[in-house]
Amino acid sequence: MLDVEAQEPPKGKWSTPPFDPRFPSQNQIRNCYQNFLDYHRCLKTRTRRGKSTQPCEYYFRVYHSLCPISWVESWNEQIKNGIFAGKI
Amino acid sequence: MAHAAQVGLQDATSPIMEELITFHDHALMIIFLICFLVLYALFLTLTTKLTNTNISDAQEMETVWTILPAIILVLIALPSLRILYMTDEVNDPSLTIKSIGHQWYWTYEYTDYGGLIFNSYMLPPLFLEPGDLRLLDVDNRVVLPIEAPIRMMITSQDVLHSWAVPTLGLKTDAIPGRLNQTTFTATRPGVYYGQCSEICGANHSFMPIVLELIPLKIFEMGPVFTL
């Protein structure tokens, strides 16, 4: 299973997630969840192909900014235990 | 912030609140106009002993006072809808802050700024210093820059709360399992107060919100890290 203890991204020109037209409503839970899934899918795909996972950093930044930390910790725990409901 | 015995709206600190105040005045003027018109008509009809046969079963009058209210409602609805959609704009935010409601305090997460997380409890009366505000001051303020669009992600960990700051025109429900988004841009520096606005238990009245809005240059110097 992928290492879910993602490293803190390096300091850079990151501001905050921009407006995502896929999620225009006030409820941003899908935005948070989708970027979390995208991050882990990206890690999985690029690791399998032996490529650098640096492009996955964007998804990490987005979900790290949008998702409450307790949610992320809960999901990471589920991934570790192999009981995460989402499809990665 | 509100002063003692205030019954009007607080001074605006964001463009949204400026629009809301203008709309409030607009709607209130229409309400006054209609109330005085109706009261005047009632007064006239109740104080006369005469009967006007032209008023009974008057089709023209029925038509007028059916169409005219519809026009008035449209005059109220159009600016209202405009402001409603303005409040939903995200406006390319510069900073994202997460506010998580608990019984009975708020947790704030600055994950764009080094992952700072802190709880914000109301200062108990015994801890108040001269000049502190009873039931409003907290131990850790939320410090934010002015003139920058800020996105608030609001949720709750246990029961329903509502994150409300009247001077910014903000009131967004904190619902467990749902992540509500709202944005605002402050136009002037200062300390602004809000309170939980959804009954959440015995201490619902004791979980205030304090925002300290400072110029961006000072915010960039990093006082937020010296909380």
Swiss-Prot record, chain A:
It is found in: Mitochondrion inner membrane. It is a peripheral membrane protein. Disulfide bonds join 32-67, 42-56. Residues 29-75 form the CHCH domain. Testis specific. Weak expression in thymus and heart. Expressed in cancer cell lines. A motif (Cx9C motif) lies at residues 32-42. Residues 1-22 are annotated as: Disordered. Component of the cytochrome c oxidase, the last enzyme in the mitochondrial electron transport chain which drives oxidative phosphorylation. The respiratory chain contains 3 multisubunit complexes succinate dehydrogenase (complex II, CII), ubiquinol-cytochrome c oxidoreductase (cytochrome b-c1 complex, complex III, CIII) and cytochrome c oxidase (complex IV, CIV), that cooperate to transfer electrons derived from NADH and succinate to molecular oxygen, creating an electrochemical gradient over the inner membrane that drives transmembrane transport and the ATP synthase. This is Cytochrome c oxidase subunit 6B2.
Swiss-Prot record, chain B:
It catalyses: 4 Fe(II)-[cytochrome c] + O2 + 8 H(+)(in) = 4 Fe(III)-[cytochrome c] + 2 H2O + 4 H(+)(out). The chain crosses the membrane at residues 15-45, 60-87. Residues 46-59 are mitochondrial matrix. InterPro entries: CcO_II, CcO_II-like_C, CcO_II_C, Copper_CuA, Cupredoxin, Cyt_c_oxidase_su2, Cyt_c_oxidase_su2_TM_dom, Cyt_c_oxidase_su2_TM_sf. It is an enzyme of class 7 (translocase). Its main location: mitochondrion. Its cofactor is Cu cation. One of its GO terms (cellular component) is mitochondrial matrix. Residues 1-14, 88-227 are mitochondrial intermembrane. Keywords: Copper, Disease variant, Electron transport, Magnesium, Membrane, Metal-binding, Mitochondrion, Mitochondrion inner membrane, Primary mitochondrial disease, Respiratory chain, Translocase, Transmembrane, Transmembrane helix, Transport. One of its GO terms (biological process) is response to hypoxia. PANTHER family: CYTOCHROME C OXIDASE SUBUNIT 2 (PTHR22888:SF9), CYTOCHROME C OXIDASE, SUBUNIT II (PTHR22888). Component of the cytochrome c oxidase, the last enzyme in the mitochondrial electron transport chain which drives oxidative phosphorylation. The respiratory chain contains 3 multisubunit complexes succinate dehydrogenase (complex II, CII), ubiquinol-cytochrome c oxidoreductase (cytochrome b-c1 complex, complex III, CIII) and cytochrome c oxidase (complex IV, CIV), that cooperate to transfer electrons derived from NADH and succinate to molecular oxygen, creating an electrochemical gradient over the inner membrane that drives transmembrane transport and the ATP synthase. Belongs to the cytochrome c oxidase subunit 2 family. This is Cytochrome c oxidase subunit 2. The gene is MT-CO2.
